[in-house]
Amino acid sequence: MSEFATSRVESGSQQTSIHSTPIVQKLETDESPIQTKSEYTNAELPAKPIAAYWTVICLCLMIAFGGFVFGWDTGTISGFVNQTDFKRRFGQMKSDGTYYLSDVRTGLIVGIFNIGCAFGGLTLGRLGDMYGRRIGLMCVVLVYIVGIVIQIASSDKWYQYFIGRIISGMGVGGIAVLSPTLISETAPKHIRGTCVSFYQLMITLGIFLGYCTNYGTKDYSNSVQWRVPLGLNFAFAIFMIAGMLMVPESPRFLVEKGRYEDAKRSLAKSNKVTIEDPSIVAEMDTIMANVETERLAGNASWGELFSNKGAILPRVIMGIMIQSLQQLTGNNYFFYYGTTIFNAVGMKDSFQTSIVLGIVNFASTFVALYTVDKFGRRKCLLGGSASMAICFVIFSTVGVTSLYPNGKDQPSSKAAGNVMIVFTCLFIFFFAISWAPIAYVIVAESYPLRVKNRAMAIAVGANWIWGFLIGFFTPFITSAIGFSYGYVFMGCLVFSFFYVFFFVCETKGLTLEEVNEMYVEGVKPWKSGSWISKEKRVSEE
């Protein structure tokens, strides 16, 4: 984990250093004494072989399981809107007696989930500050379950299903804030990027298995088509609640609440060492100094997020932009409407093609678990933006110029369709190893503890709002301009490349306290990869 780092409070032109010695003296009157900082100043949790991290990896996978229920929803809803029983119950009848979902109703059913997520992230994420990240996660999963029950109970009223989507979205919004937060505050710094990426890994697993379940139920003629996938998600949510009982609470939250012995036990459990280990004492020293610094600054407010004090505002803006740009890569164009898209390119069984996309997405995320800590956040984001832009140029150009050589009322070109599917798979590969996990990693690492949940809620809320806009308007836009829609996302990807270069700092290999120090110092993003903390600079001298 981290070395001892002196925390600082900026007050006007004065700089006050807050050392951990007073905190240690205070603790000696409250709980079992902790050795003074001088004995362990240079103690640090060293990097270990991967086998030594199996305990914390398993814990982080359980915390990240919240991403699975989100991914399952994304994977299943893309099939629901094309299933016969779903359209019969919640759609409208044509003059020939067949049923369909209008563009408006499809957009609302698919997109409203994201509005629920945005609202849930902004409101329910606060539970993590009140009751702890772990208990907060359990509460928001319960909200999600309520929404699932309402959807399962829907019979023929589309607005009942619509309401259930809003409520389940609120639960997922809370999960999206609390799950990466708890992982980032629990995982050792050497594998923190990888562990936070588990959240995206679980999303991709959920999408893939959701596609598979749709394929398995599509031949039924009744509500089994969509109620079975929803029922399975209910079971998965119950499993996550049970799993949270085995997960330790965030040591940083515990220190903030004065539960120092519990914090030491949490750190020791995550790192497979004893609570007396010098590195645990040094880590506690660092966390306590940082928490005390934030406590002296007073209670956090929403207004503080929009002030320049402590370089908070630039980080809030960066988080909003990163999460917005993740949606504007165009990934959900494929994930929400993949089945519809591949119907358009002439695939006989578009459900099978969606499964292929799910496999590519899931398998590629394993690559991201390696690259995020090997190459760093900035390089992965920059490379992902460039690669995905190229994929969209080819996908859209082929779709516009070659897919229908004899007109849209004639059969499509199989060769052109195959090229589009190949570049769709390549797009998903590049997305899965870059923007998919790292957008969550960046926001989970960038904020100080006292404003973290609120800042993350705003950032992730921006993601959900863009998700709604894309989910709702995509049917209308594709009806109007077809595959030229891809050029819009290509432009967004070009913008994202330059935004990352000029505004996103590298956080690879830094403790959360060091990340905060780097932002306070005002390090230029393109120079952040070589930045080292003040304490390390002093020790090297």
From Swiss-Prot:
Keywords attached to this entry: Acetylation, Glycoprotein, Membrane, Phosphoprotein, Repeat, Sugar transport, Transmembrane, Transmembrane helix, Transport
One BP annotation, GO: carbohydrate transport
Extracellular side, ranges: 71-107, 156-162, 214-227, 348-350, 401-418, 478-484
GO cellular component terms attached to this protein's record: cell periphery; fungal-type vacuole; plasma membrane
Transmembrane segments: 50-70, 108-128, 135-155, 163-183, 193-213, 228-248, 328-347, 351-371, 380-400, 419-439, 457-477, 485-505
Swiss-Prot/TrEMBL induction comment: Repressed at high glucose concentrations.
Positions where Phosphoserine occurs in the chain: S11, S13, S17, S20, S32, S266, S539
Disordered as annotated region, ranges: 1-22
Location in the cell: Membrane
Glycosylated position list: N82
Keyword Membrane listed: yes
Modified residues (N-acetylserine): S2
Keyword Phosphoprotein annotated: yes
Regions annotated as coiled coil: none
PROSITE patterns documented for this protein: MFS, SUGAR_TRANSPORT_1, SUGAR_TRANSPORT_2
Note: Glucose transport is thought to be mediated by two kinetically distinct systems, a glucose-repressible high-affinity system and a constitutive low-affinity system.
Primary role: High-affinity glucose transporter. Is only indispensable for growth on low glucose-containing media, because S.cerevisiae possesses other sugar transporters.
Family note: Belongs to the major facilitator superfamily. Sugar transporter (TC 2.A.1.1) family.
Listed name of the protein: High-affinity glucose transporter HXT2
Organism: Saccharomyces cerevisiae (strain ATCC 204508 / S288c)
